[in-house]
Amino acid sequence: AFSGILAEADIAAALKACEAAGTFNYKAFFAKVGLTGKSADDIKKAFFVIDQDKSGFIEEDELKLFLQVFSAGARALTDDETKAFLKAGDSDGDGAIGVEEWAALVKA
């Protein structure tokens, strides 16, 4: 799903680092997976991969399954992790992360 954007080895390392429930940190994950240093274009491409229902927003249910977009065998985020992730990215308070909010979150 992320071929041409992210390296498989980086994805594997990023997933390994947050294997245990409660250890997911979006900033650390973005850095490890190599997203932080990507172009605005690649960051937007990643958004559209994560936006599974193609609504133009990443909603709470998509955030919960965020890691599984990177690898089908990955765990779901805990409710606390999901809510913290949403709160960090949802700057306008509409309950979802839009593409501009996503770009700002990745670069934060």
Curated annotation (Swiss-Prot):
Lipid metabolism in keyword set: no
Detail which positions bind Ca(2+) 2: 90, 92, 94, 96, 101
**Keyword annotations from UniProtKB, A to Z:** Acetylation, Allergen, Calcium, Metal-binding, Muscle protein, Repeat
EF-hand domain span? 38-73, 77-108
* GO molecular function term, any single one: calcium ion binding
Q: Which residues bind Ca(2+) 1?
A: 51, 53, 55, 57, 59, 62
Q: Does the keyword Iron-sulfur apply?
A: no
Q: Which residues carry this modification: N-acetylalanine?
A: 1
Q: Name one GO cellular component term.
A: cytoplasm
Extra remark = Is regarded as an important allergen.
* Family note: Belongs to the parvalbumin family.
Its biological purpose is as follows: In muscle, parvalbumin is thought to be involved in relaxation after contraction. It binds two calcium ions.
Protein name per its UniProtKB record = Parvalbumin beta 2
Q: Which organism is it from?
A: Merluccius capensis
Source lineage: Eukaryota, Metazoa, Chordata, Craniata, Vertebrata
